[in-house]
């Protein structure tokens, strides 16, 4: 179910404080965050976030196309290594 429009997009308070501080300083340092659930809003354009994927931090540069998505959508948590059985069958034949 989609979020109500009257509520507005969800952004964690600590992330919003870091965004406001980064806009004032404008030094280009990435913002380190574990908040994958925060929605990307227009105030974040031009900033880089280091989003935690459960193991490491993935750098995400925010552009206009990212608005409305969540930060976690750009930091995948799973890596697909492939199905080993299909490779073995091709080599054997």
Curated annotation (Swiss-Prot):
Descriptive protein name: Small ribosomal subunit protein uS19
Assigned keywords, A-Z: Ribonucleoprotein, Ribosomal protein, RNA-binding, rRNA-binding
GO biological process per UniProt: ribosomal small subunit assembly; translation
Gene Ontology molecular function: rRNA binding; structural constituent of ribosome
Gene3D superfamilies: 30s Ribosomal Protein S19, Chain A
NCBIfam families associated with the record: rpsS_bact (TIGR01050)
Function: Protein S19 forms a complex with S13 that binds strongly to the 16S ribosomal RNA.
InterPro entries: Ribosomal_uS19 (IPR002222), Ribosomal_uS19_bac-type (IPR005732), Ribosomal_uS19_CS (IPR020934), Ribosomal_uS19_SF (IPR023575)
Residue runs in coiled coils: none
GO CC terms: cytoplasm; small ribosomal subunit
PROSITE patterns: RIBOSOMAL_S19
Family that this chain belongs to: Belongs to the universal ribosomal protein uS19 family.
